[in-house]
Amino acid sequence: EEVCLALGIYARRVRFLPYSPFDFDCHVVTEIYDRSQEKWYMLDPTTNGYLVDEQGTILSLLEARERMADTRFVTYCKATSREKNLQKLYRKNISRTAYYAKNLFRIQVDAVSQFGESGNWLNFPPEHFSIREWSVASAEYRLEMVPAYAKGYADFDEAVQLPRMREAVE
């Protein structure tokens, strides 16, 4: 995102998260805005790829989520791939496409596109989804799992973190 902004390209940092409050996974990508097309395009710098429809048109995350929800064609493409047959690409990249599908339940966009993170996100959950209920369920699960969770982190101070986590649930 920051490289694009430095080059004068409208860009935003986008996180996408799964439905389950027990799945702590999320993925962060960059979307760039094409002024001539008046459209956002998702680029994944982590995997060096993007998502396309059956015509090979690069999609935004919102477009990909909508298409996946309607069981329409979406596939992951590696930027270095020379394969033109999208059905072959789909079969080859099914696990990566499935990973995106799993995490495309909830989308968060930086409230302000800037250098560094502002910490403020705009949420784009599906209709009728309660972020508060999800957050409470996730916090309760983490509280339950704290002993196992904390073992992997030397800087995790239970005396400090547990009260904060309990407060978030209340």
Please give the residue ranges for each predicted region.
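Cysteine-centered nucleophilic/redox motifs
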Residues: 1-15, 30
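His-Asp-centered catalytic microenvironments across diverse enzyme cores
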Residues: 20-22, 32-170
